Amino acid sequence: MLLGRTAVKRFMSLRIPRSHLLYTHTRTPSLPDRISVHDLQVRMHAGLDAWGRFVPQPVHIDAHLYTEVSRAGQSDHVEHTHNYGTLYRALERFAADTHCTSLDQVAEGCMNICLNECHAPYAEVHIRLPRALLHADAAGMILARAKDETANVLDQLCIQQLRVDAILGVNPWERERKERVIVDVDVSPATCAPYEAIAHSVY
């Protein structure tokens, strides 16, 4: 389970600044309310794992539905809002019944549930594969979509806590041994290049 960001083992941490909760940047002002499922953990086919095998692997899912719930508050009728139980069960069913061949297929499938099964006007999903890369905590993808396609969208590929050994510094004693550096890599818009190749180019 991804419990947070750990410190570098030795002296320093090189970090590419990012916002882990991207909904604070992409949400639309006309939809002030959010219904979320956080860190749903499933096992499913989601592409190759860190050893190049096409086998079920752990997948962590965050899903956010953006809406306006004032009508439900006034009427006290559940049909006027979005049911997080419906979202949760649909995501679990998707994981159990679907064999995806890539990370982006998982993300698009979850987004389809948010917009078309749960009828959210705007949604975000964040998918993490904690066993996708040997030298990183996770590979992931963040998508933001509007049902009517009028709001801004986001496609972002993420590599979290990529561990790299590198020579740091210009002094002679600093160049005798490599130091451990931990890097977060975000690519936006998401590239078609596999995250394995991106991680290898950094590593």
How would you name each of these model-derived features?
Residues 2-203:
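N-terminal, polar/charged subdomain of small-to-medium soluble alpha/beta proteins
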